[in-house]
Amino acid sequence: FIEHCQLEDAYGYTPSDFPDAQLNQLELDELLAAIKAKNLEAIYPLSPMQQGMLFHSFYAPESGVYVEQMTLKLKGDVNVAAFKAAWQKVVDRYSILRTLFIWENRPTPLQVVLKQVDLPWNNLDWRSFSTAEQQQQLSQLLTSQKQLGFQFNVAPLMECTLIQLSHDT
């Protein structure tokens, strides 16, 4: 029995692991099956503010009202691997960036914090576009990402896109 419990594949959770969620074993098992994740850190109810934000995100999903976008222009040689690793460390450090939300078939929504998630990362090469085309492409990309929004039941609720504009930007 002890050897089995020490196997990497052996895991299990009970309601006592997540007392704030107020789940029974059946509800916890259903939640685990829904998120297909073994690396749970915590399960919490949503704060009233989070409940309101989730409601408004579903009420008008195309509005992107809670989608924040940040653009930075980096000059010089960028070590892409180090830059990506630094952003991954930010996600690793802050639990809110490893959080997903479960609401379907639930009387009240829950937030689920995972121990580890991989930050979605995109690399784009726009060096062949003119400056005007780059601006147009960026505008279209930001608009489409904002309208697309997020899958709230998949962590993390963020992604990074690194766009190379020239040999040093």
Where in this protein do the model-derived segments appear?
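Acyl-group handoff/entry surfaces in thioester-processing enzymes
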Residues: 1-11, 38-120, 129-169
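AMP-binding/adenylate-forming catalytic domain of the ANL superfamily
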Residues: 3-27
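C-terminal, charged and often intrinsically disordered regions of DNA end-processing helicases
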Residues: 26-44
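Helicase-core coupling region on the C-terminal RecA-like lobe
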Residues: 126
